[in-house]
Design a protein with these regions (language model features):
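Phosphate/dinucleotide-binding and metal-coordinating scaffold of catalytic cores
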Residues: 22-325
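Sec-dependent N-terminal signal peptides
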Residues: 5-18
């Protein structure tokens, strides 16, 4: 009886491990994944260009193979904003495996984010930055993938773990709390321009926040308003609504890695999730232009196209506050 019990325990552990650690294994940095996209439409590039130009988040269908495993009726669109161009041959991709077929996934992963390594001849910025960030706060796993499109090698991409419900479960132990992607619909590059920075309250009506925050949970607008209101009216109570330690780590990491395409630049490219302690946690995102690749530091023309590494290293840590907040 004892040996039979031990046998079943080992079976259970084996099955559990394959689920719990599948995402980490898929993103191991010593592995280069092979991903093949076979679009249903011959003019797939024109269709994706059109969706991007029109500002639509629609997807077109394709079959996708990942390390030899094939998935059908997958939804594909471009990923990102500044890294996409209709003039580019190599654009970034957002691949949704369960777009049509419910629960379709690869080793527990239902969405792939492939970055085109724009402005990074070293191919190291994004993967290295996430590796550093994960030592101090929850952040995506990332490695590399060779991408083939309709049988043609399209190039080497960075393969970045999506910040989604699976990510939330793994890092926070829950997935249903208020969850926001903090990216404005229309980026405002002017000094003092409104973006997804928490110094700006848009009132108690959720409609005022829609242009700046994309809600990815079933509820949470009132929680976001409470966070912003507390930060701006009763800052002494900040620790009741915000994980201050992780917030400081995010700012420190952005400054140390000279990553200005983030909160400290335009006030964008981060997530907020309300944990079980009722504190919002920032989640760093979009590190493809770290180590000085992004030149517009504070939504002004202060250093646009001209600042050097020395200037970046000695930048005032309050530059974002002085120009934006």
């Amino acid at each position: 009886m004892f040996f039979r019990l031990i046998f079943f325990i080992f079976i259970f552990i084996g099955l559990s491990s394959s689920t719990l650690f599948s995402q980490s294994a898929f993103y191991e940095t010593d592995a280069i994944r092979e991903i093949q996209i076979d679009f249903y439409d011959e003019n797939w590039d024109h269709l994706l260009d059109s969706l991007y130009v029109e500002g639509e988040n629609g997807r077109i269908l394709a079959n996708v193979s990942i390390d030899g495993s094939t998935y059908y009726s997958v939804g594909v669109r471009y990923k990102g904003y500044s890294s996409v161009s209709v003039n580019n041959i190599k654009n970034p991709f957002n691949i949704k495996l369960d777009h049509v077929i419910e629960d379709q996934n690869h080793e527990g992963i239902d969405k792939l984010k492939l970055s085109n390594v724009i402005h990074d001849p070293s191919f190291l910025r994004e993967v290295l930055s996430y590796e550093v960030c994960r030592k101090y706060m929850p952040a995506s796993n990332a490695n590399y993938a060779n991408l083939y499109i309709n049988g043609v090698l399209w190039g080497l991409y960075t393969n970045v773990e999506a910040v989604n419900k699976e990510f939330l479960i793994e890092n926070f132990g829950s997935k249903y709390s208020p969850f926001f992607k903090c990216n404005p619909e229309d980026l405002n590059i002017q000094i003092g321009g409104l973006n997804s920075d928490l110094s700006n309250s848009h009132g108690s009506d959720s409609a005022g926040y829609v242009p700046y925050y994309d809600i990815e949970s079933d509820y949470g607008w009132s929680h976001l308003y409470h966070l912003i209101d507390t930060l701006n009216t009763v800052p002494e109570e900040i620790e009741k609504v915000l994980n201050v330690d992780r917030t400081l780590w995010m700012h420190a990491l952005n400054y140390s890695m000279i990553n200005f395409d983030s909160y400290i630049g335009y006030g964008q490219n981060y997530y907020l999730y309300l944990d079980q302690a009722s504190q919002f946690n920032p989640i760093i995102w979009d590190l493809n232009m770290s180590f000085g690749s992004f030149r517009l530091t504070d939504a002004s023309q202060l250093f646009y196209g001209s600042f050097d590494i020395s200037q970046a290293q000695n930048m005032d840590p309050l530059v974002h506050h002085n120009f934006i907040s």
